[in-house]
């Protein structure tokens, strides 16, 4: 997965709620590594599934993003989580 594309896709589609790894919808479920691990979402597959299908306040991106774009943004989120969103 291409992290440059992942960053662009994140900026265009995710940053309005998840800038800096935060979560404006459900504050305790951030995109930080510890929270992703706590909620069983610290994998490209889990992040990709949530982006694809949505959950609770998060909309589904299935019709808006191609599968390869979802894979790129999931890889980007994992990389940023690993780096503590710095």
From Swiss-Prot:
A GO BP annotation: photosynthesis
Subcellular location, record wording: Cellular thylakoid lumen
GO molecular function terms listed in the Swiss-Prot or TrEMBL record: electron transfer activity; heme binding; iron ion binding
Keyword hit for Flavoprotein: no
Superkingdom, natural source: Bacteria
Binding site for heme c: 14, 17-18, 58
GO cellular component: plasma membrane-derived thylakoid lumen
PTM: Binds 1 heme c group covalently per subunit.
Key words of the record: Electron transport, Heme, Iron, Metal-binding, Photosynthesis, Thylakoid, Transport
Family per record: Belongs to the cytochrome c family. PetJ subfamily.
Name under which the protein is recorded: Cytochrome c6
The organism of origin for this protein: Anabaena variabilis
């Amino acid at each position: 997965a291409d992290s440059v594309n992942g960053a662009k896709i994140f900026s265009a589609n995710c940053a309005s709620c998840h800038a800096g790894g935060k979560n404006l919808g459900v504050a305790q479920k951030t995109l930080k590594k510890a929270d992703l691990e706590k909620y069983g979402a610290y994998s490209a597959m889990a992040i990709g599934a949530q982006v694809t299908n949505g959950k609770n306040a998060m909309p589904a991106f299935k019709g808006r993003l191609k599968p390869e774009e979802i894979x790129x943004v999931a890889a980007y989120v994992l990389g940023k989580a690993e780096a503590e969103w710095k």
